[in-house]
Amino acid sequence: MSELDPNRVVLSPAQKARRINQNPDLYGTFAEIGAGQETVRHFFRAGGASQTIAKAMSAYDKDFSNAIYGPEPGNRFVCESRLKNMLRHEFGLMLERLSRKDHPTKKFFTFANTIASSTYERPHSGHGWIGVRFQTAPDRPTSDVIIHVRLHDPDISLQQESVGIMGVNLIHACFFHHKDPQEIMTALYDNVSRHVVEIDMIQMNGPDFSQVDNRLLSLQLVKRGYTDAVIFGPDGQNLQASEALYKKNILAIRGSFRPVTKVNIDMIMNGYNTVSYTHLDVYKRQGASCPLE
């Protein structure tokens, strides 16, 4: 049963993995780096994984990871760009190495995650990116679902277990609920508590989600209590706040902005000028150049 809908039947991770393994047309690769090497284990333990899993790998060493997927700006590893590069690289290898003549009915997929668990020095720092690139028909272009999670369980092993279950939920939802984005969001928390895993960003792209407004998905995250705040860009694409604001100077103005008025513009410009002058004065006293100049 679901905590949101008592009448909704919730499958266990083993049941979901087994359902995928028993489908002869689903075939894919798993790439899990960092602390998130738990998802594929559910598929191996469910039985029948040989007809589902083309490859399972973990480029755990940072140098090896960079050699495979390329370095990221700032030499980061747990970031959205790394996840997207993993999905692109691994799915590309499937198309390159598997002949469509030999697999005419297969619907390919790639699951990837890059996770940093909490440490004793930073007990609430666990977070990561999880994503699936998949086909809903053999000749259909791929669609992507990407989420960012924050891990709040104090036990590192339980953080990893939660990530593994959520990965199974995501793969299962992409294949069996791709026509209902709301159900995908609901299914992500099957057998996972919202108190231990927080989803603060979700993005659905591709032909199977051509009618999806990702901004509304962001608002759903807040409405459902999955997270406290969300951010999206002017292009309508959802952003993960710490990723989008990484090493940025931030000026925030409260308001509805419907429409944007001259008063709103004046507030922004006066606020910016105030912050700029304050920072400029501080940097000059320190004998350094101000990044806001």
Language-model segments: residues:
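Non-catalytic propeptide/linker segments at domain boundaries
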Residues: 179-240, 245-246
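Short alpha-helical segments enriched in small residues
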Residues: 2-139
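A short, charged/proline- and glycine-enriched loop
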Residues: 23-25, 243-251
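Short, glycine-rich nucleotide/cofactor-binding loops
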Residues: 32-33, 253-267
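N-terminal accessory interaction module
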Residues: 95-192
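Conserved small/polar residues in nucleotide/adenosyl-binding loops
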Residues: 278-286
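Histidine-anchored nucleotide/phosphate-binding helix
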Residues: 263-277
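N-terminal low-complexity segments that are often proline-rich with Ser/Thr-Pro
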Residues: 286-292
